[in-house]
Amino acid sequence: MKKVFIALMALSMVCVEFTSCDKDSGFTADPTTQPIAGKTYRETVSADSYSQFSFHMNYRCTMEAKKPGESPVANSYFEWWMSPGDNEVVIRYAQGAYDKTTGKSLSGQTFLSGSYNATQNTVTLSGDFDGQHFTYTLKEQK
C-alpha cells in the first residue's frame, strides 16, 4: 500500500484528505493516463487556497472530507481517470462511498472533474462540496 496525503483547501477551509492509496485495488493504469501519473501538482491561481496532488493514476484511495475541528462528513474511495479522447480528468466516488452525516450513498457520483492541458502541463478541476463550488488549477511541481 502506498501512503499518500492530498489536501484541498479553499477560503471556506474545507479540507479533503486522501489518506491512503492501494495500487493493488484492481484499478489499472491506462497508457493514456501516463502524462500525469505519479507527478505532483500544486495550485497556481489563488494565494488563498492550496492544493497538492501526489499519487498515481487509477489508484483507489481512502478519503475523508471535513472542515477543521469537525468530524469527517464522508469516508469513501475515489477513482481518478482520464478519457483518452479529450483529456477529461474525473475524480469520482467509487463503490461503497457514503455520506457519514446522512448515510446516503455517494457511489459513482463525480467529486471533481476537469481537464489536462498537455501544452501547459496543468490540470484544472472543479466541483461542489458542502454546498460550495470550487475550482482548482494544478501545475506539475518539478
Mark where each language-model region is:
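Secondary-structure capping and domain/repeat boundary segments
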Residues: 53-55
